[in-house]
Amino acid sequence: MDEFHRCGKEDSFWQQCFLYPLFFKEDLYAISHDHYLDVSSSSRPMEHLSSNDQLSFLTVKRLIGQIRKQNHSIVLFVNCDPNPLADRKKSFYSESVLEALTLVLEVPFSIWSKYSVEGMNESKSFRSIHSIFPFLEDKFPHSNSILDARIPYSIHPEILVRTFRRWIRDAPSLHPLRSVLYEYRNSTENLQRSIIVVPRVNTRFFLFLWNYYVCECESILFSRLKRSSHSRSLSHGSFPQRTHFHRKIKHIIIFSRRNSLKSIWSLKDPKIHYVRYGERPIIAIKGAHLLVKKCRYYLLIFRQFYFHLWSEPYRVCSHQLSKNCSSSPGYFLRVRMNPILVRTKMLDELFIADLITDEIDPIVPIVPIIGLLATEKFCDISGRPISKLSWTSLTDDDILDRFDQIWRNLFHYYSGSFDRDGLYRIKYILSLSCAKTLACKHKSTIRVVRKELGPELFKKSFSKEREFDSLRFSSKAAARSQRERIWHSDIPQINPLANSWQKIQDLKIENLFDQ
C-alpha cells in the first residue's frame, strides 16, 4: 500500500482505473485487521478481546471469493463469524472488510487532495479549527449579513456512488461500495430509502464518507461562486475611513478611463467569505439584501440539483448582524459599533476625529449553558445547584478534578467574550454542586465540607483565573485589554457542550418554520 501511494502524479490514471484488483490481496485485509485491533484495543480493555478477534485467512479467502463472483449479498452488518459471542451486535470481520474498503477508496482521494492543495494559489484556505475565531474577527465586522446553513445528513446511497464515479474510473471497484451502502441502509430500517452520513460515528469508513461528502459539496460550491464573483479578496483593515473612501471613488470613476474601471470597481464588489465548523457552514456576505436572498436561494437549488436533496427552508437561515445574533461554535455572535477617538496634532493645534469601526461581540450563552447543566443533573431548570448523585461513588480527588475540569473548559473557551459576568453564575452553580456532592457522599452538610476543604474547591481553576485577570488588568495592559481579547480555543474539550445547545437552537428554528 505504501508503494502504491508513492507512485505519484504520473501513475494517478492507473490508480484510478485499476483499484479493483486490490480487493483480492490478502495483505490488504491483514492491514485493516491490525488497524481495527488498534482502534478496538484503545476503546476496550485487553481482557474483553476474545479469540474471535483473531484474523482467519480462511474467512478472508471466502470473502474474496464472494467479491470475485460479484456477489452483491455480502453480509457485513450482521454477525458472520463462525463462533460468535451471543452479545456481540457487530461482526468482527465486517469491520475488517469495511476497513479494507476504506483503504482502497482513500488511495485516489489522498493523491487528489495532495495536488489540489499544492496547486491552490488563487484563494486562501485555512484548515485549522483554531483559525475560526481570527476569521470571525477579521471578516464578520465587515459583513452585513450571514447565511447559517446546515449540511444535510440524509442522502440516497446511489447519489454517493455517482459522486464517487466522478473521481474513480474503475467501475468494478464501486460494486462493493454500493453493496455496503445498500446493506447498511436496509439494516438500519430506514423508511426514507436513504442513509445517514454523520461525522460522529467512530468508524473509519463513515468518517471517510463524511469527509468526502463535505469535500464534494464545497468543491462544487466554490467553483460556482468563483464563476459568479469577479471581486478580489481585499483587506478592509487598510481602509479605516472606508465611508469617505467610497465617496472619493464616485468622483474618480467619472474621470477615469474604461481600462481602469475594473481595478476601482473591484473595491465595491460584494465580498463572500466562507467558514465551516463541523456540519455548520457559515457564509458572510457584504452586499445588498437582494444578494443575500439570491445566495440563500442558490444554496437550496444547489443541493436539490447536484445531490437530489429537498432542503427544508430552515436549514439555510439569513441574519443581519446589526439586528440579530447568530450562533457559531458555542457563542452568540453579533456586530456592535465601536467609536474610536483619534487625536492628531498638527502645527501646534489639536484636531479631534471620530472613527466608527465595527467589531465582533461574542456573547456567552448563559441560559443554554444552565439548561445543559440541568440536563446533566448539576442544577435544576431554574439554575439552583443540586448534588451529582452519580459521582458520589468516586473519590474526593476525582470529584474535585471533574468539577475543576468543567469549569476550566468553560472559562477558557468563553474568555474571548468581553462580557463574562454570566460565567460567575456558572461558577457559583458548579462550586455549590460540587460541595453538595461531597456532602451527600460523606453524609454531612455543605458548611462542614467548605470548612474542611476550604480553598481546595476549584483551586486549580481559581489560580488560572487569577493569573488571567492579573495579566488582563495589569497597569501596563489595562488600556490594551479594552481593545483586545484572548482566545484560548479549547475546542476539543467544549465541543459536546457547543453541539448540544446548538441542537436546542435548531429545534427552536424548526418550530418557527412549522408554525
Curated annotation (Swiss-Prot):
Superkingdom of origin organism: Eukaryota
Organism the protein comes from: Pinus clausa (Sand pine)
Function: Usually encoded in the trnK tRNA gene intron. Probably assists in splicing its own and other chloroplast group II introns.
Gene Ontology MF term list: RNA binding
Name of the protein in question: Maturase K
Subcellular location: Plastid, Chloroplast
Gene of this entry: matK
GO CC, one annotated term: chloroplast
Pfam families: Intron_maturas2, MatK_N
Family: Belongs to the intron maturase 2 family. MatK subfamily.
Record bears the keyword Kinase: no
Alphabetically ordered keywords of this record: Chloroplast, mRNA processing, Plastid, RNA-binding, tRNA processing
Single Gene Ontology BP annotation: mRNA processing
